[in-house]
Amino acid sequence: MEREARSRTGLRVLIGLLFLVVLLAVIWFVTLPALRPTWTDQPSSEDVVQAFRDRGLEVGKSYPVEQEPGWDERPVPKTYEEATRFEIPSLGEEAGGRVFVFRTQRNLDTVRDYYEGLPTSIRPYVYVQNGVLLQLNSNMSQSEAQKYKDVLTATA
């Protein structure tokens, strides 16, 4: 009887360990694609901003988004690999856009969902090409925003 009880306990431990191994394997296979780079041969965010300049689009100062005053307090998800803030002086002080470069679709979707979830009155233009997200101030006209989108499409 005692031997039978030990045998059942051992079997329960073995089943528990097997369940744990299967669970860990499932978690690994589910998260692995999110960790692998989705895109290759992406331009840097500064390359995209320079392409705007080269094509004659209005671009004032540009700098890494981390140098933007108050960036750390902004609720924009920080899932990007690198990003550049650029100003468009005709839109007013501190108005312009940002170019974000992402490693995975999941990280890109997090930022795109944030911007697209903003109230319509302040929702910026958001364009995506090859893992690069362009966010433009909503004060700009649709036709002007389209010019930046076209350069992004040609560059990324």
Question: Where do the protein language model's features map onto the residues?
Answer:
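Soluble, non-membrane globular domain cores that form compact, hydrophobic packing
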Residues: 1-96, 102-156
